[in-house]
Amino acid sequence: MSWQTYVDDHLMCEIEGNHLTSAAIIGQDGSVWAQSSTFPQFKPEEITAIMNDFNEPGSLAPTGLYLSGTKYMVIQGEPGAVIRGKKGPGGVTVKKTNQALIIGIYDEPMTPGQCNMIVERLGDYLIDQGL
């Protein structure tokens, strides 16, 4: 299965009539493995900052999580495993696997819980596969 299929079928899937605004699977080095057509163009330093927070949990909290210049307020996550951000009625979930970052961006009417479930479910599966 291609990485694009994971994005299209597992991240951009419909859940209770809603779906993510955009999603991507990005290597920990910042290389794009696959992304939805709507995923924003991010800056390499934004991925570096996210990786730093996984290595030093809490480092993003004072500054916020930036993706494509958009600032998300960092909310509760799982240190070293999941970072969650909020901006208005939407937000972002980032799940770290052994080799990649799974990123889901959502907006109303999708809920934070639905986004978390989609992103973390695929992340957990990839971790189980050694990826």
UniProtKB/Swiss-Prot annotation:
Transmembrane segments: none annotated. One of its GO terms (cellular component) is cytoplasm. InterPro entries: PFN (IPR048278), PFN_euk (IPR005455), PFN_sf (IPR036140), Profilin_CS (IPR027310). Pfam families: Profilin. Keywords: Actin-binding, Cytoplasm, Cytoskeleton. It is found in: Cytoplasm, Cytoskeleton. CDD domains: PROF. GO terms for molecular function: actin binding. Its main location: cytoplasm. Belongs to the profilin family. PANTHER family: PROFILIN, PROFILIN-1. Occurs in many kinds of cells as a complex with monomeric actin in a 1:1 ratio. Binds to actin and affects the structure of the cytoskeleton. At high concentrations, profilin prevents the polymerization of actin, whereas it enhances it at low concentrations. By binding to PIP2, it inhibits the formation of IP3 and DG. This is Profilin-1.
